[in-house]
Each structure stands twice: as structure tokens, then as C-alpha cells.
Amino acid sequence: MNSNEKIFSVLRAPRVSEKTARLQELSNQYVFEVSNEATKADVKAAVEQLFDVKVEAVNVVNVKGKNKSFRNRAGRRGDWRKAYVRLADGQSIDVTAKA
């Protein structure tokens, strides 16, 4: 697996919401959905390499999937993992840019 494949297997998508927008403004933190097997070191390396920024800290949260029903059938959404990435002062990422 080359380095680009490794990066995109670790980082799945940025999470964009009111909460994440507030974190970006106040504490220079960005939130990404990451692979369930990704470690903090993997996330840090992937963000630094992909966006060419300096990462100060990474916090990771395991999010449990919700129980949902559809037409009287019970189902469960999958568990996923998100990473809060704090960048060094003066650096930023444009997560709304189109690929």
C-alpha cells in the first residue's frame, strides 16, 4: 500500500456541523471521520502529510451506532470513530474545498 492509499484509508471524511465550525473558530480544531483501526499517530501523520500542516494534538472518540427502525424492522447503524485534530497556531485547513 503506497502512502496515498494509507492516508485515504485512515481519513474517511471531514465532519462538518455547527459544533465543528465553532471548534475551528475557537480552538483551531478540526474533526474527521477515521478508520476504526486508525491510531492517533496514524491520524496525525495522515493530516500532516495530506494538508501540509503541523498537528499539535489528536483526540479520538469511538461513536456507537444508533438503533433505528424502518417499516417495523429493527436495525442498527454501524459504529464509527472520529478524531479531533488541533493544529498549531496560525495554520488552517479548508475542509469545504471541492476535491
UniProtKB/Swiss-Prot annotation:
Keywords: Ribonucleoprotein, Ribosomal protein, RNA-binding, rRNA-binding
BP GO terms, sorted: translation
Keyword match Ribosomal protein: yes
One annotated GO molecular function: structural constituent of ribosome
Ribosomal protein keyword on record: yes
HAMAP family hit by this protein: Ribosomal_uL23_B (MF_01369_B)
The protein's assembly and partners: Part of the 50S ribosomal subunit. Contacts protein L29, and trigger factor when it is bound to the ribosome.
Family to which this protein belongs: Belongs to the universal ribosomal protein uL23 family.
Role description: One of the early assembly proteins it binds 23S rRNA. One of the proteins that surrounds the polypeptide exit tunnel on the outside of the ribosome. Forms the main docking site for trigger factor binding to the ribosome.
Name the UniProt record assigns to this protein: Large ribosomal subunit protein uL23
Species whose genome carries this gene: Stenotrophomonas maltophilia (strain K279a)
Name of the coding gene: rplW
